Amino acid sequence: MSQIMYNYPAMLAHAAEMNTYSGALHAVGADIAAEQHALASAWQGDTGMTYQAWQAQWNQAMEELVRAYRAMATTHEQNTMAMSARDQAEGAKWG
């Protein structure tokens, strides 16, 4: 029977890195939104209305993406901590 080995510090570092990436995604989204906002005043009538609808969809999609990525990072961290605690508890049984 083979053993399954986990590198908990590396797994936690990966979760932290995922949180960093979610922050980067948020920053890129904010930059793009600022650029689009600068252009919005030039779009009027039907074009302006179409732009506003597109921008609302884009903003919502970006928020959902960032929220989902943060949730993945949090879940990864929580599961890693739970696995580590379980390993320690099982190890304590063996003295």
UniProtKB/Swiss-Prot annotation:
One of its GO terms (cellular component) is extracellular region. Signal peptide: none annotated. Gene3D superfamilies: ESAT-6-like. It is found in: Secreted. It comes from the Bacteria. Keywords: Secreted. The keyword Secreted applies. Pfam families: WXG100 (PF06013). The keyword Electron transport does not apply. Coiled coil: none annotated. Belongs to the WXG100 family. ESAT-6 subfamily. Forms a tight 1:1 complex with EsxG. This is ESAT-6-like protein EsxH. It comes from Mycolicibacterium smegmatis (strain ATCC 700084 / mc(2)155) (Mycobacterium smegmatis). The gene is esxH.
